[in-house]
């Protein structure tokens, strides 16, 4: 379970790459909340937590502008959810029974599709004089487009289950979606999925 957060992120990336960007009517239809946890963890045994006041950002585009203006709002949503489940926030991480980290990933993705503009195979075979097959024709128009997706990852890290200076992630939640629309609409959708991560984790309580 030490690499639970990383495995979850990789799995999500593979899953979402098979879904984007077609098959839905609105950007909200692409929003998803995914959670995973250590089935051997006793979440009722934890009592206090600490959480940094900033989000760690990662991007696959070196020119991406990382905006921290919503850090406080996102961290507050995460903090409130843990408090609602009976945990107490402390300022000193050394006295906390678990640490909460929040990370954000931004990806520029490229996809394409081939437009089969001919009507049927009869048209294709009859296109070349004499009906002979020509390996270079007809031409299939290829459309290439880019879209930006983002993920906010919450990791719940036990401070008592360390070994070889490695931490143990006992719960992870990911809010994923397309980064389209106004900044406020994007943050509203992110917060909705963050809340959903906790809703679908009923075992996560003191």
Task: Briefly describe each language-model feature range.
Residues 1-5:
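Positively charged n-region of N-terminal signal peptides that target proteins for export
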Residues 15-18:
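C-terminal motif of bacterial Sec signal peptides marking the signal peptidase cleavage site
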Residues 20-23:
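Bacterial signal peptide processing site
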Residues 28-45:
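Post-signal peptide N-terminal segment of mature Sec-exported envelope proteins
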Residues 47, 96-98, 148-153, 171:
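Envelope-exposed proteins and targeting segments
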Residues 54-103:
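N-terminal segment of the mature soluble domain
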Residues 102-162:
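Surface-exposed short loop/turn segments
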Residues 161-194:
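Short secondary-structure boundary motifs at beta->alpha junctions and helix caps
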């Amino acid at each position: 379970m030490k690499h639970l957060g990383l495995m979850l992120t990789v799995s999500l990336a593979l899953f979402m790459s098979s879904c984007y960007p077609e098959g839905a009517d609105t950007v909200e239809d692409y929003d998803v909340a995914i959670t995973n946890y250590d089935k051997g963890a006793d979440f009722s045994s934890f009592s206090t937590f600490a959480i940094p006041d900033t989000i760690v950002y990662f991007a696959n585009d070196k020119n991406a502008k990382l905006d921290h203006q919503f850090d406080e709002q996102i961290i507050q949503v995460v903090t409130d959810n843990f408090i609602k489940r009976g945990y107490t926030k402390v300022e000193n991480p050394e006295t906390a029974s678990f640490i909460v980290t929040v990370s954000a990933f931004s990806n520029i993705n490229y996809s394409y599709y081939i437009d089969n503009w001919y009507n049927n195979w009869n048209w294709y075979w009859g296109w070349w004089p004499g009906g002979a097959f020509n390996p270079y024709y007809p031409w299939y128009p290829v459309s290439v487009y880019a879209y930006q997706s983002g993920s906010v990852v919450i990791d719940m890290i036990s401070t008592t289950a360390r070994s070889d200076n490695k931490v143990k992630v006992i719960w992870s939640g990911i809010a994923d979606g397309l980064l389209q629309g106004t900044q406020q609409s994007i943050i509203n959708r992110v917060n909705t999925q963050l809340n959903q991560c906790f809703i679908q984790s009923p075992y996560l309580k003191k």
